[in-house]
């Protein structure tokens, strides 16, 4: 038989088993061959077509793992022999291509075998596209099953998988039809689709198992098989494709119950199998769903009532159940609302005491069912129901457990107390190791019922009705068939009219029990989803119904050779290691003795203290043996004399139903019988001896929610929903609806005019009330009276973070100079560790072990493992021995055709014959209670439009609790599906020389290299602002980056966190006497907010109660008291950039966390494309600080999205290896300067290179003045910058800052070549008359004679510049050769009047040149572009002395030139052509003390700064009491709004005031030492067209050539559009002028060649002219940015204040910065922080350095909003240094109280501690722009529940 069974499901490829089997029995060899063939066929059949997809296997859940392989299952997935159980923690997601082959077509068949453990709305699986749209999904709702075929397309089937049963089903997706196939293809429900479904699945999408999206609720249950077949027809014969383990999982295999607490569903209590009443033939009733055999000898019944107190091992003797002190509970009450938790609800529910009497074994394999001969039933049974108290047990008819049990643990009475709300599964004490001999009940004839012959004293305990709506299992007419003899049935029927059966005390008489099955293990189905209450049936009727229709079910034996007495403790105990979920284990004490003697059904309750993953994992079951002979007498029962059990007497008449208890109160009207007319209406109620009608009986009628214990005390209505009744300031609920911001105070009077630059200081944050509904945005207040333009205000507070700009270009590449002689070779850099960094870096630090990844697609089909289970000792045998079910051939290869529906291998789904209509009733019941509303899960993605869920009745709303603490900031949610990495910006044009990347980590100091030859003279750097004096320490070896610092101190102790998930209710106390439920009291008025209590510890999870029926929707509760300020919520993402709309309300600003330790510098990720400016959201009130959520890992850098919350600082990457230095290339020819290349992405910091070889001796540089030692470096490099926030509106002009300290002398640079004329400089403001004469500058080196410039157009009259420092007289320039007199050019357009240039130095008299031939009258040439500085030619021969040039106008001092990038030290190369000065590189690590540099020239004094950008609106004012409304500040970008206060007075829009007079003159700065001559400034403003100048000296000569006749001067160049004829005419003139030379000297250049070259030259010049013109006239756009905002002030068009783009280093446009320009106050350039709550600016260091160089002063505001917290103390009597905050400047200096640098504190409201929010305003004004922006705020006081603060960082404005 075993072989037959083993081959039953081999499939069609195999020969019929019986024939071969017989042969095999005769011939061993042939048998062996047959086994091989069968095995091969099995492999072939199980492997299936190569295209079939085993989803579990594809997700890495291989069966070998399920069966005990070594590989651990993923978290939240628990393997068990038949598959995997998915818990809430399960997270299985994989790319769709890893799970489904791309060749999978649109026609599919899904074959599923599963059992749900929790009622929820989870998806079993979902396939989503790369855009996160649902493409295919299967969702199980209570009572319905939805197939989603797209985001808005779904099909619903009336299939409820949440009934605790195993369901085997298939779905066919073909064309526009979806078909649900159950019952092995016998039941099909096709549903046409209204529209075409999506064509194909997105291969780049994702496959999620158990949920719809990563944040959705998880499917919790067991999954045996999930396969997808490309042939849709598979669905019609899906049973042939079910794995054998799945076919048998609910027939022979242990049920996998809900072994974990049900949060939202009913918990389970354990009950003995009612079928144990007979103890002979223990079968599983397909209609009852709670019990699951756990292992041999053990059974766990998960019933809806689980005691909340630990159940100790208690043995009960049924013989004592009928004592007079155990009156029966009126059965009607019990029957009505009690779910049947076990196969026969006989014991769980008096209505169905025997109805699950041993059903005929249900046969699952393809053998025809065989009927069991009736056997003698036993007479006793036991129902263990959770009792409220021992007294209640007595009342409820449950036996008192008084007999001591010699177990390993002291037994105590069962005192379980169902909680009225949630009850978690009871924990289980150590399993009893020994069994007591039960005392057989002695049933005298008098003790038998006169009709049924059942023992009179046999009373069936009732189960307290759970307050739930679970429909009774009886509502489903498909019940297990009970093999009740007709005569006996009639007896029972007859008795029903006079016994308690009519009252539903007893349901059916026991069926015959086969002795041969005495070792069969009772197995029941899970009753969790078989709610009671929908259909009330008498047990008798149930019995009849069960007799009529049901498939036989096979009992499960213990082990093949063991009787219960032989069962080892291992069979009956559970190892602690196997316990993972609380569960009760119920073991028959005597374990089914087969001897024909009355049995006392004693059971041991084992309370497993720890959760058991699966009790069934206690070892593989042995192979199922044949039914043994009747075993020896069973183990001793507990009660009764210890003597051996007498021989089993003939079975009584189905076990006495027990004497009727004393008349109980008249029961409620019984449920109508399933088969009307079959129940005897006879003395209805008399049989039940209904008691007086008064007491509702222990089951009490009330208690719709709680699970009343057996005593029937109605539980209170389930605790109202997740919001518990407000206890003493109950858990603060989730943040309540935004409450009003306090009672709006009276409209505040107009506040004082804000400090300059502040946009109306944000009111102090009010106490966090219940966040009010954001009020309407107040109208703009009346404009303040235009005040005098004040001093330059500090920059306004930051606006919302702007989009991050594209990566800034590297600093301006200086004009490519001629390759200079190589500079001194630097000290050899540290030797590179390796060669150039290869493509693959060295392995990073070993990451933490990730969770088990989704296994790749397994190669070979893994189904072979199924067969492998045959090798296990028990499985094949157990499955294969369904007893009479062995005939597998009836259904042919299907193997499962016999059982109706896959659902049913229990077959319950089909209507049970005559009782079909009743079955329909059952169906609604099967839906089970609508679970209480689950706790709000994370908001999932918008789910598909599912059908509306069954609305649960709304519970009585509890009074609104106080607003709960905002919960922990959620972990940064499961990272949204990582955005795709943003596109890398376009590859910039290849710049000439890229910026040197940020210096790699300083390597070990190399030997001092030989001083190289002097480098090409760089442009003189402008005098830097005085650097901070700092000793030049060698840069310390960068310490290893510590791990990212723990998140800073917890932010202020938040008020209580969100209401945590409701802890499980604690064990219910002893059930008190039942009190009447009080009426819900009137809703109390909100009390005054109490003192904020410390957050209570999270309560222990209480046991889970039964699911209460959702109460009716209550009226909205009264608005709760304002809660404590919630912890700061995470900052919402910045919205998508909109057009600059009206100022939106500020978005909620999250509570700033304490500054974390400096994180390690993260690698700069590729900058995404800049997002558009997001709308400024409303500023949320500072929430109470929640507990710090776990920091989410940094996600992939996505497309530039809205700035999200700052991610964790990434760990510092490994240092890159330093590449070997390349040989210096030969100097290239000086090329025309190309467009600035777009900056490359910032390279990662290379690893410290190895010590380099000793460099060549460099030339000794000029000795600089030693710098003071620098301050110690900041802790670590800053992490990557976040995105750039949008710039706030300009703030008002702040007061002039004090002059900065004088800078230190820098190195004297080598005189650079004469720069090209700079672009027109910005108009300076009227400078003040200098009072002091600057120190004379050092003598300038003699510059090369410049080419004569074209006459410039007259420039606008410039403002008088400051008086420059008297420069030293330069050496006279070399005398140039006289130029060739050129033809008279056309008069060019009149140039604007140029400013008076500096007087030219008298040149040496040049040699008189020969008079050239009179040139032809030249055509007026087009105005030439200003040519690039050509390479410095070799010194020519002295020319004839030229005429003295006219003194040029003194030009304005040019702006500081952009520093060129610092190039890496190369090996000493051949001296190259002098290069153009490069842009200043990023600051390297502090090197050795350099030679002291010369002082640079003092920078131009900038104009008074304009008002800074208005800052963000301050934190919300104190709750409800708006401060006096300030007068209208200058309009700026709306700050973040605080909570909506009362609308302010409408302000008048301020009229634009006239341009203010220059601000007050700042304090006289210290005259710095005379600086070096600065580099050539950028081209100054175009001067007025000057009169034609005298001929200038000829430029330096080229290499001597044959001396030619002086030619005519080239045509003047004007930046106008060339026409070809102009070019040709001009060139013709040139040709003509050179004709003489050709004739004279015999040149024979072809004219055409010359003309072509000339045209190209002119085109190049034209291009350069346009380029320079764009530089001279920037537009402030991203493509044509200005250097700083001041550049835009001098444009011809009037610019309005607003957002512009600047590029301080004038590199390529990709690194432009979006800033806010405040032209009203002098052209301030304002940088906004990334977020207003952090001092971080998304500006590269290079750009910031240039911006500092181009600025002379800076201003910034920082506001600290505080609640009962002092942040600043300064004064003689205050310990200022300890308690005052400190601000770290950009250059590392510290602003602190009492220090050298102190901020201005214009308002210090934080010193007021009155429980309201105040603010302290710090203003930083400095003439050392390098101090700004402020990069960190330190020494902030720690936060606590009543002390909080928030930062508001304003923009840093530079002028």
Curated annotation (Swiss-Prot):
Residues 1-48 form the signal peptide. Residues 81-246 form the Laminin G-like domain. It holds the Pfam family COLFI. GO terms for molecular function: extracellular matrix structural constituent; extracellular matrix structural constituent conferring tensile strength; metal ion binding. PROSITE patterns: NC1_FIB. It is found in: Secreted, Extracellular space, Extracellular matrix. Residues 619-1612 are annotated as: Triple-helical region. Residues 1655-1855 form the Fibrillar collagen NC1 domain. Disulfide bonds join 1685-1717, 1726-1853, 1762-1806. Plays a role during the calcification of cartilage and the transition of cartilage to bone. PANTHER family: COLLAGEN ALPHA-1(XXIII) CHAIN-LIKE ISOFORM X2, SI:CH211-266K2.1. Belongs to the fibrillar collagen family. This is Collagen alpha-1(XXVII) chain. It comes from Rattus norvegicus. The lineage of its organism: Eukaryota, Metazoa, Chordata, Craniata, Vertebrata. The gene is Col27a1.
């Amino acid at each position: 038989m075993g072989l037959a069974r083993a081959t039953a499901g081999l499939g069609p490829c195999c020969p019929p088993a019986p024939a071969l089997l017989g042969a095999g029995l005769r011939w061993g060899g042939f048998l062996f061959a047959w086994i091989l063939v069968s095995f091969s066929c099995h492999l072939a059949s199980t492997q299936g077509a190569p295209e079939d997809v085993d989803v579990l296997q594809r997700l890495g859940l291989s069966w070998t793992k399920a069966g005990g392989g070594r590989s651990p299952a993923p978290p939240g997935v628990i393997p068990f022999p038949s598959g995997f159980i998915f818990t809430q923690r399960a997270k299985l997601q994989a790319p769709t291509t890893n799970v489904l082959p791309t060749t999978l077509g649109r026609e599919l068949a899904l074959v599923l075998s599963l059992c749900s453990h929790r009622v929820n709305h989870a998806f079993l699986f979902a396939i989503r596209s790369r855009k996160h749209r649902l493409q295919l999904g299967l969702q199980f709702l209570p009572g319905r099953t939805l197939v989603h075929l797209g985001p808005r397309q779904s099909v619903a089937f009336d299939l409820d998988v949440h009934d605790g049963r195993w369901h085997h089903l298939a779905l066919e997706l073909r064309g526009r039809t979806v078909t649900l196939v159950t019952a092995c293809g016998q039941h099909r429900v096709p549903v046409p689709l209204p529209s075409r479904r999506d064509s194909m699945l997105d291969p780049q999408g994702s496959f999620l198992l158990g949920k719809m999206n990563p944040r959705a609720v998880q499917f919790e249950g067991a999954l045996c098989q999930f396969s997808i077949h490309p042939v849709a027809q598979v669905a019609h014969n899906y049973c042939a494709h079910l794995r054998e383990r799945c076919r048998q999982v609910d027939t022979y295999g242990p049920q996998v119950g809900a072994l974990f607490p049900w949060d939202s569903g009913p918990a389970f209590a354990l009950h003995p199998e009612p079928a144990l009443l007979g103890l002979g033939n223990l079968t599983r009733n397909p209609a009852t769903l709670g019990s699951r055999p756990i292992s041999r000898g053990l059974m766990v019944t998960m019933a809806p009532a689980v005691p909340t107190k630990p159940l100790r091992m208690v043995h009960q003797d049924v013989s004592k159940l009928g004592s007079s002190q155990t009156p029966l509970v009126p059965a009607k009450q019990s029957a009505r609302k009690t779910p049947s938790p076990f196969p026969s609800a006989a014991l769980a529910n008096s209505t169905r005491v025997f109805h699950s009497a041993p059903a005929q074994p249900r046969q699952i394999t393809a053998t025809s069912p065989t009927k069991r001969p009736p056997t003698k039933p036993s007479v006793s049974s036991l129902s263990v129901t959770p009792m409220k108290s021992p007294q209640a047990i007595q009342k409820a008819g449950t036996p008192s457990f008084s007999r001591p049990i010699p177990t390993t643990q002291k037994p105590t009475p069962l005192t379980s107390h169902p909680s009225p709300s949630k009850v978690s599964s009871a924990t289980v004490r150590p399993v009893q190791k020994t069994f007591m001999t039960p005392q057989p009940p002695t049933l005298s004839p008098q003790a038998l019922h006169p009709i049924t012959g059942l023992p009179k004293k046999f009373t069936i305990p009732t189960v307290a009705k759970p307050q739930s709506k679970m429909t009774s299992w009886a509502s489903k007419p498909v019940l297990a068939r009970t093999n009740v003899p007709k005569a006996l049935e009639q007896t029972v029927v007859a008795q029903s009219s006079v016994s308690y059966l009519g009252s539903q005390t007893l349901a059916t008489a026991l069926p015959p029990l086969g002795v041969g099955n005495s070792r069969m293990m009772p197995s029941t189905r899970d009753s969790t989803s078989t709610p009671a209450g929908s259909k009330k049936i008498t047990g008798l009727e149930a019995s009849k119904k069960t007799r009529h229709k049901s498939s036989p079910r096979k009992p499960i034996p213990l082990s093949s050779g063991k009787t219960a007495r032989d069962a080892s403790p291992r069979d009956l105990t559970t190892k602690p290691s196997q316990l993972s979920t609380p569960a009760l284990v119920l073991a028959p004490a005597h374990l089914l003795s087969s001897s024909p003697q009355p049995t006392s059904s004693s059971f041991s309750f084992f309370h497993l203290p720890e959760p058991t993953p699966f009790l069934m994992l206690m070892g593989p079951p042995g192979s199922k043996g044949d039914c043994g002979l009747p075993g020896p007498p069973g183990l001793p029962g507990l009660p009764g004399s210890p003597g051996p059990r007498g021989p089993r007497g003939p079975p009584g008449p189905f076990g006495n139903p027990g004497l009727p208890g004393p008349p109980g109160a008249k029961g409620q009207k019984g449920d109508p019988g399933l088969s009307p007319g079959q129940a005897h209406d006879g003395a209805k109620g008399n049989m039940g001896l209904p008691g007086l009608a008064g007491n509702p009986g222990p089951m009490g009628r009330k208690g719709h929610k709680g699970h009343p214990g057996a005593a029937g005390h109605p539980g209170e209505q389930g605790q109202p929903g997740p919001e518990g009744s407000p206890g003493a300031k109950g858990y603060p609920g989730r943040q309540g609806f935004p409450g009003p911001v306090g009672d709006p105070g009276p409209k505040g009077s107009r506040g004082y005019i804000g400090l300059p630059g502040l946009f109306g200081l944000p009111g102090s944050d009010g106490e966090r009330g219940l966040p009010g509904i954001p009020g309407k945005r107040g109208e703009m207040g009346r404009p303040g009276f235009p005040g005098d333009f004040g001093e330059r205000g500090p920059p306004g507070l930051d606006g919302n973070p702007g989009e991050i700009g594209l990566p800034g270009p590297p600093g301006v590449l200086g004009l490519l100079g001629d390759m200079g002689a190589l500079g001194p070779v630097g000290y050899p850099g540290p030797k590179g560790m390796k060669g150039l960094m290869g493509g693959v870096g060295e392995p990073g630090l070993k990451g933490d072990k990730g969770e088990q990844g989704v296994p790749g697609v397994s190669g070979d089909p893994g189904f072979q493992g199924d067969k492998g289970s045959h090798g296990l000792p028990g499985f094949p045998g157990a499955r294969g021995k369904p007893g009479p079910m062995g005939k597998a051939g009836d259904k042919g290869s299907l193997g499962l055709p016999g059982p109706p529906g896959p659902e049913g291998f229990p077959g319950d789904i089909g209507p049970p014959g005559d009782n079909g209509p009743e079955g329909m009733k059952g169906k609604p019941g099967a839906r089970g209670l609508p679970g209480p509303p689950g706790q709000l899960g994370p908001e999932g993605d918008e789910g598909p439009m599912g059908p509306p869920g069954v609305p649960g009745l709304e519970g009585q709303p509890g009074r609104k609790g106080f607003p709960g603490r905002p919960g922990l900031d959620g972990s940064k949610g499961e990272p949204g599906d990582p955005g795709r990495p943003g596109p890398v910006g376009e590859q910039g044009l290849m710049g000439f020389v890229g910026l040197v990347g940020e210096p790699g980590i300083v390597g070990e100091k190399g030997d001092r290299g030989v001083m190289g030859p002097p480098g090409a003279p760089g442009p003189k750097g402008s005098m830097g602002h005085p650097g901070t004096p700092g000793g030049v320490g060698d840069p310390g070896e960068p310490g290893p980056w510590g791990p990212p610092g723990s998140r800073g101190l917890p932010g202020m102790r938040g008020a209580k966190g969100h209401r945590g998930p409701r802890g499980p209710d604690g064990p219910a106390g002893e059930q008190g006497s039942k009190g009447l439920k009080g009426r819900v009291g009137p809703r109390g008025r909100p009390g005054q907010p109490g003192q904020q209590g410390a957050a209570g510890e999270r309560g222990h999870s209480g046991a889970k109660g039964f699911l209460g029926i959702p109460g009716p929707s209550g009226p909205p509760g009264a608005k709760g008291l304002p809660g404590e300020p919630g912890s700061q919520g995470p900052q919402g993402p910045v919205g998508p950039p909109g057009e600059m709309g009206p100022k939106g309300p500020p978005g909620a600003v999250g509570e700033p966390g304490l500054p974390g330790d400096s994180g390690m510098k993260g690698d700069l990720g590729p900058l995404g494309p800049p997002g558009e400016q997001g709308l400024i959201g409303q500023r949320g009130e500072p929430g109470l600080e929640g507990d710090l959520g776990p920091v989410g890992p940094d996600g992939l850098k996505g497309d530039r999205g809205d700035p999200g919350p700052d991610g964790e600082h990434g760990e510092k990457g490994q240092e890159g290896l330093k590449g070997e230095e390349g040989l210096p290339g030969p100097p290239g020819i000086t090329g025309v300067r190309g467009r600035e290349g777009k900056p490359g992405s910032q390279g990662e910091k290379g690893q410290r290179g190895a010590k380099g070889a000793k460099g060549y001796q460099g030339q000794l540089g000029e000795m600089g003045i030693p710098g003071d030692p620098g301050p110690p470096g900041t802790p670590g490099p800053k992490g990557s910058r976040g995105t750039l926030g949008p710039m706030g509106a300009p703030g008002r002009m702040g007061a002039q800052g004090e002059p900065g300290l004088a800078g230190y002398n820098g190195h004297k640079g080598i005189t650079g070549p004469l720069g090209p004329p700079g672009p027109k400089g910005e108009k300076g403001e009227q400078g003040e008359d200098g009072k002091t004469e600057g120190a004379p500058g050092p003598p300038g080196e003699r510059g090369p004679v410049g080419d004569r410039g074209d006459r410039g157009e007259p420039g606008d009259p410039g403002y008088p510049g400051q008086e420059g420092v008297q420069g030293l007289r330069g050496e006279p320039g070399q005398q140039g050769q006289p130029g060739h007199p050129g033809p008279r050019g056309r008069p060019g357009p009149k140039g604007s009047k140029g400013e008076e240039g500096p007087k030219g130095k008298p040149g040496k008299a040049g040699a008189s040149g020969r008079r050239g031939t009179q040139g032809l009258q030249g055509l007026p040439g087009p105005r030439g572009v200003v040519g690039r500085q050509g390479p410095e030619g070799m010194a020519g021969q002295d020319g004839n002395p030229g005429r003295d040039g006219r003194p040029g106008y003194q030009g304005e001092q040019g702006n500081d030139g952009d520093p060129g990038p610092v190039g890496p030290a190369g090996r000493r190369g051949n001296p190259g052509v002098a290069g153009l000065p490069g842009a200043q590189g990023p600051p390297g690590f502090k090197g050795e003390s350099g030679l002291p540099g010369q002082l640079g020239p003092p920078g131009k004094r900038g104009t008074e700064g304009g008002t800074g950008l208005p800052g963000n609106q301050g934190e919300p004012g104190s709750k409800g009491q708006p401060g006096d409304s300030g007068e209208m500040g200058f309009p700026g970008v709306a700050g973040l709004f605080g909570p909506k206060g009362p609308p302010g007075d409408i302000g008048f829009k301020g009229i634009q005031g006239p341009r203010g007079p220059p601000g007050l003159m700042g304090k006289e700065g210290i005259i710095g030492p005379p600086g070096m001559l600065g580099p050539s400034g950028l081209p100054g403003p175009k001067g007025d067209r000057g009169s034609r100048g005298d001929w200038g000296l000829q430029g330096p000569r080229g290499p001597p050539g044959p001396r030619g006749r002086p030619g005519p001067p080239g045509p003047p160049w004007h930046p106008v559009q060339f026409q070809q004829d102009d070019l040709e005419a001009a060139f013709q003139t040139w040709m003509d002028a050179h004709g003489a030379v050709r004739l004279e000297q015999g040149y024979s250049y072809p004219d055409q060649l010359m003309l072509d070259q000339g045209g190209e030259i002119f085109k190049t010049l034209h291009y350069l002219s346009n380029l320079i013109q764009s530089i001279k006239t920037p537009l402030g756009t991203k493509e044509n940015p200005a250097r700083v905002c001041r550049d835009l002030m001098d444009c011809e068009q009037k610019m309005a204040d607003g957002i512009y783009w600047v590029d301080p280093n004038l590199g390529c446009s990709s690194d432009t910065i979006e800033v806010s320009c405040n032209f009203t106050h002098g052209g301030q350039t304002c940088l906004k922080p990334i977020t207003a709550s952090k001092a971080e600016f998304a500006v590269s260091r290079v750009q910031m350095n240039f911006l500092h160089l181009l600025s002379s002063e800076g201003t910034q505001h920082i506001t600290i909003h505080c609640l009962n917290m002092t942040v600043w103390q300064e004064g003689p009597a205050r310990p200022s240094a300890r308690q005052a905050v400190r601000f770290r400047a950009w250059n590392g200096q510290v602003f602190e109280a009492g220090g050298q640098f102190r901020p201005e504190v214009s308002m210090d409201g934080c010193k007021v501690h009155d429980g309201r929010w105040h603010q302290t305003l710090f203003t930083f004004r400095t003439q050392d722009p390098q101090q700004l922006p402020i990069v960190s705020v330190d020494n902030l006081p720690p936060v606590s529940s009543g002390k909080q603060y928030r930062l508001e960082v304003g923009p840093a404005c530079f002028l």
